[in-house]
């Protein structure tokens, strides 16, 4: 699926021409020219009866020959889907673990020269964008591990002077449909300049008075505009200054200062029976008044005031706004585990979330490729687990998955200290945002497992076997062989050993301490629990457990139920991904469960969200085909992103989403092959009166190697997410149980389509208005 960064190590082989020294290692790093070519994404036949594959070539050359760099090497590189068939006799390719592969010289290899030496190979699944090809190689020799690995210069990521975006110059151009479409049945269009010109929608509206997200009700009181250049004077009743300080700071940043001589803004909070924030904002000729039912309502009213502001002349329209959100849960998931995001990025994201009235930050802090939160007493989680570099022993860092290279100071590495995390919590609270931490388990736990194994080895060497064993996450007698969905053979906690739960209890207790220190209660914890393979078949502990537990169903369900009870005892709500929660027995779970519905709408998985909502759980919609912001904006090889759930997620697609009526999208969208599909709701209907709890966008980070790349993928889609999470549009097709939808079913009428298009034009006009924020 992705060809990632290369890391070449000069490696001892059985009969090397020359034994490499550091000079030769350095030379190869500087002079080896590597080119990657995607030959075909849809071969007529795949070797070894593989259902789906793609065909690629690597070529190696040097400008001048160096016989000392001819044979004593291996090339390590990241490719997320396994290479399974290699042609020719120049090189052999071996899958190591996860996405790490190794190239070694084979019998036909006679040395590098100015003429390219090539290897062609087949990889499982598919690859369609240049961002799925990563950079970087390193050099070392196994028989002398004291040599320093060197990144091969030709594979370094470069900055494009025209676009300012990162690019890999070692990739040959992607120019044909055979490099974009994944099979003979794939009709995905090439969304280049010609396509975009033909499908452009010219703006038909000037920037009207309005807000993102759209308020429930907005009435223009006058064509006059109120001048705030002299500042504002907030008069508060029933609310503390701290509760609105960050909204006030945003206004100040935009040029509206807080001063006693400024225009009076009366802010009154009077609680009522309604728990959701509800506010009225009135901008009159001589004053501004805000009435809300809680502090969040007043905060959002001031954010609306900032959104109405013309930043050129500091004037605002005279309006009356009555507003309340569609969903109580309006979230953004940020993955900082695969590739790290700086604290500054998180704080800035919190500011933007608050500006557009999002209120939940799901922080994905641990996965196979990194552990990003310091835990008191378990230093190895971050000293080892927060870094990827080249260390085959994994005692000082994890393997360089996702093409991480060998630099521990690279942007992809790092963690939040206790003080960093406390600062994030407090900053989020000040912006009326709740942080939901997640340390994914029992799958996606390789960083934790390897870090605790490094801890075990260190303490054993110090003669402390009891301490060493306490948090060890490996059962040495377990001989189960498996491959996870990301092709790891060692990334899943053994759910049958006591140490696993000792470790989890320790981690959860320490996370709760951090929340307590911040003055921000840990209300909800997301356990992850997704994509866990059928494992532990040869585990003695699991065989014993299975025999001893009455009504045993499955190991993943057992794990989730046990951790859920642990969280419930600590007074913490349980959240998890729907695929893992599908393994539990509802009767064995706490009553208050949050399920992130991962149902891919067009793959007939909407029933998952319906099923969990029907059993009384709080379902937060997380449909990958519309809410995953690590996917491309358009189906074009230059667009960054993954492609398994959707070939293109434009801001407009997020805007068009009708979250209360999942099957209805069969009328307006197509599947990943650009084909129409049918959604039959008759067997999986929502019960009458059942509603979803919220909507969440997702910024996964496998392909986002820098904060700049993350920003590119997040904006402006974040604003479209906020629009749908806050505002229920008039054009959305109401849900009706049991309907069957298709491109020809006709429920989404021409009138509704016209209303949607007019609403989109309003949204675009506001978004593109340089005079507002």
Curated annotation (Swiss-Prot):
Record key words, sorted: Disulfide bond, Glycosidase, Hydrolase, Signal
Q: Which GO terms describe its molecular function?
A: beta-N-acetylhexosaminidase activity; polysaccharide binding
The catalytic residues are 531
Which enzyme type, at the first EC level? hydrolase
GO terms for biological process?
A: carbohydrate metabolic process; glycosaminoglycan metabolic process
Asked whether the keyword Signal is assigned, the reply is yes
Which InterPro entries does the record associate with it? Beta_hexosaminidase_sua/sub, CBM2/CBM3_carb-bd_dom_sf, CBM2_carb-bd_dom_sf, CHB/HEX_N_dom, Glyco_hydro_20_cat, Glycoside_hydrolase_SF, Hex-like_dom2, HEX_bac_N
What EC number(s) does its UniProt record assign? 3.2.1.52
Pfam families, sorted: CHB_HEX, Glyco_hydro_20, Glyco_hydro_20b
| Signal peptide start-end | 1-19
The reactions it catalyses are: Hydrolysis of terminal non-reducing N-acetyl-D-hexosamine residues in N-acetyl-beta-D-hexosaminides
Q: What is the superkingdom listed in this entry's lineage? A: Bacteria
From the record, give the transmembrane residue ranges: none
Q: Which GO terms describe its cellular component?
A: membrane
Instruction: Report the record's disulfide bonds.
Output: 46-53, 389-397, 496-542
What the entry lists under PANTHER family is as follows:
BETA-HEXOSAMINIDASE, BETA-N-ACETYLHEXOSAMINIDASE
Q: Which family is it part of?
A: Belongs to the glycosyl hydrolase 20 family.
The name this protein goes by in its record: Beta-hexosaminidase B
* Native organism: Pseudoalteromonas piscicida
At the highest ranks, the source species' classification is: Bacteria, Pseudomonadati, Pseudomonadota, Gammaproteobacteria, Alteromonadales
């Amino acid at each position: 699926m992705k060809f990632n960064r290369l890391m070449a190590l000069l490696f001892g082989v059985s009969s090397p021409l020359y034994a490499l020294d550091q000079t030769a290692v350095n030379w190869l790093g500087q002079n080896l020219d590597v080119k990657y070519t995607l030959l075909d994404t849809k071969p007529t036949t795949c070797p070894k009866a593989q259902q789906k594959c793609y065909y690629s070539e690597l070529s190696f050359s040097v400008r001048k020959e160096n016989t000392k760099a001819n044979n004593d090497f291996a090339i390590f590189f990241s490719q997320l889907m396994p290479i399974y068939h290699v042609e020719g006799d120049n090189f052999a390719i071996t899958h190591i673990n996860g996405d790490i592969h190794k190239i070694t010289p084979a019998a036909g290899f006679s040395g590098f020269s100015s003429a390219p030496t090539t290897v062609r190979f087949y990889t499982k699944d598919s690859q369609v964008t240049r961002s799925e090809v990563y950079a970087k190689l390193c050099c070392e020799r196994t028989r002398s591990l004291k040599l320093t690995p060197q990144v091969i210069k030709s594979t370094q990521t470069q900055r494009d002077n025209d676009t300012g975006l990162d690019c890999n110059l070692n990739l040959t151009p992607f120019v044909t449909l055979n490099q974009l479409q994944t099979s003979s049945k794939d009709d995905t269009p090439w969304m280049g300049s010609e396509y975009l010109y033909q499908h452009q929608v010219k703006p038909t509206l000037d920037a009207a008075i309005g807000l993102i997200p759209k308020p429930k009700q907005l009435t223009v009181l006058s064509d006059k505009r109120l001048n705030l250049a002299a500042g504002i004077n907030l008069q508060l009743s029933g609310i503390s200054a701290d509760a609105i300080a960050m909204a006030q700071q945003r206004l100040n940043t935009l040029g509206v200062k807080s001063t006693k001589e400024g225009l009076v803004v009366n802010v009154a909070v009077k609680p009522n029976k309604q728990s959701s924030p509800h506010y009225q904002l009135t901008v009159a000729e001589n004053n501004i008044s805000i009435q809300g039912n809680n502090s969040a309502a007043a905060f959002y009213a001031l954010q609306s005031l900032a959104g109405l502001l013309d930043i050129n002349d500091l004037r605002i329209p005279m309006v009356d706004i009555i507003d309340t959100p569609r969903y109580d849960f309006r979230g953004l998931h940020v993955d900082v585990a695969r590739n790290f995001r700086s604290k500054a990025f998180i704080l800035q994201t919190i500011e933007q979330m608050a500006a557009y009235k999002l209120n939940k930050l799901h922080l994905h802090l641990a996965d196979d490729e990194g552990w990003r939160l310091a835990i008191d007493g378990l230093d190895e989680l971050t000293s080892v687990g927060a870094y990827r570099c080249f260390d085959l022993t994994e005692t000082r860092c994890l393997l360089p998955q996702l093409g991480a290279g060998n630099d521990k100071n690279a942007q992809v590495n790092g963690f939040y200290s206790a003080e960093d995390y406390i600062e994030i919590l407090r900053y989020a609270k000040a912006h009326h945002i709740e942080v939901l931490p997640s340390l994914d388990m029992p799958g996606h736990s390789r960083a934790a497992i390897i870090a605790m194994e490094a801890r075990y080895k260190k303490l054993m060497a110090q003669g402390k076997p009891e301490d060493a064993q306490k948090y060890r996450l490996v059962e040495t007698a377990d001989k189960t062989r498996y491959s996870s969905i990301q092709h790891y053979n060692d990334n899943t906690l053994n759910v049958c050993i006591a140490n696993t739960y000792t470790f989890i209890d320790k981690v959860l207790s320490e996370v709760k301490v951090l929340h307590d220190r911040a003055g921000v209660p840990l209300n909800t914890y997301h356990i992850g629990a997704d994509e866990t393979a059928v494992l532990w078949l040869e585990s003695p502990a699991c065989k014993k457990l299975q025999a001893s537990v009455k009504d045993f169903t499955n190991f993943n369900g057992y794990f989730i139920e046990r951790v859920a009870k642990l969280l419930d005892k600590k007074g913490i709500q349980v959240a998890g991904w729907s695929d893992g929660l599908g393994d539990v027995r509802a009767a064995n779970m706490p009553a208050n469960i949050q399920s992130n519905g991962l149902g891919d709408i067009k793959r007939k998985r909407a029933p998952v969200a319906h099923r969990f909502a029907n059993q009384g759980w709080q379902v937060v919609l997380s449909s990958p085909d519309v809410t995953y912001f690590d996917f491309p904006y358009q189906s074009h090889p230059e667009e960054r992103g993954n492609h398994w759930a959707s070939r293109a997620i434009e801001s407009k697609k997020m805007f068009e989403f009708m979250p209360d009526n999942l099957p209805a999208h069969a009328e307006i969208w197509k599947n990943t092959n650009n084909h129409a599909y049918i959604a039959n709701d008759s067997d999986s209907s929502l019960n009458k009166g059942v509603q979803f709890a919220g909507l969440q966008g997702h910024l996964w980070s496998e392909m986002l190697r820098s904060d700049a790349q993350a920003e590119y993928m997040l904006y402006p889609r974040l604003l479209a997410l906020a629009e749908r999470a806050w505002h229920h549009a008039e054009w959305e097709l109401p849900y009706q149980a049991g309907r069957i939808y298709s491109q020809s079913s006709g429920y989404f009428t021409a009138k509704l389509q016209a209303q949607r298009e007019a609403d989109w034009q309003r949204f675009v006009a506001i978004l593109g208005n340089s005079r507002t924020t």
